[in-house]
Amino acid sequence: MVKRFHGILRPLRCMRAGARLPIPAYIIVPLEPIRLLIATDMQAVDALIRRRLESDVVLIRQIAEHIISSGGKRLRPALVLLAAGAIEYRGPHHHELGAVVEFIHTATLLHDDVVDESAMRRGRRTANAEFGNAASVLVGDFLYSRAFQMMVGVNSMRVMQVLADATNTIAEGEVLQLLNAHNASIGEEVYLDVVRRKTAKLFEAAAQLGAVLGGAESEVEQGLATYGRHLGTAFQLIDDVLDYSGDATQTGKNLGDDLNEGKPTLPLIRVIQHGSQADAALVRRAIEEGGRDGFESVLAAIRNTDALAYARARAREEARRACAALGALDNSIYKQSLLELARFAVERAF
């Protein structure tokens, strides 16, 4: 039987629309209880990741190891494991799919860093800065193809469908983001559409896969998919906030990376739509030109408009919707862990 919730984690109630999560903004929810819950499973996932990275092409091993070993929260594999636990799945394939979603995520990071010309991720030089753009793109392709090799081993057309749809949607999101670069005219909904495709879709697939593996009822499967979509959206919105307010030693990224790349993220869109005429014009110009030359002035415009608080509020609403989507799940320590992840997504500092 699945372990039931007996107070190891604090329960998180799903609240009415617009309500704040019941935790002070300065408190970062620890993930240690969740790590302990899935520690054995996560060790199996990590071992599988390393085993399936093996290749007789040395450069593939070097680059894949560079990014896999550079840290990261492993949230997407954790979602597979927690969702599978929440429906009491007892088969062998949740480890395999945890590794698959991490490979897909890693491939997107390799490609992202090339497109964005990024030099730093997780406090280390990016693979493209270390090994070159061509090698990074090709190893990203290898990871995608290795992920699909592993999917076949699960022998489930439904799993294949979920992951094939997800990778296609992610690619669309990448292209849309590229098209939107240096475009100061896009609105909030256009930006959120990119977020849901590029970032939230893999969260959605990871949570849904746990239900698919266990043959859960449609209501439960769709609830977990919806949870993942809103969780991933909240996660990206907080990333937007941290790009203008985070501690680089914690985030592992330089402040202002989005502005440097001309990305019109939610805080900037808020200034353009609701800031003073001068602040809106300043931010428009900064997006169109890119670079960091006007970073301090853009920060001032963001503060003047209270744009970070607005983005955080939108993230909290996404987290609330994620919680509400789990209503069909029986209460368990796994469900409570999923609720804790929603809390972490909006209160984190890294």
Across the structure, where does each feature detected by a protein language model lie?
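All-alpha prenyltransferase/terpene-synthase fold signal
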Residues: V2-F350
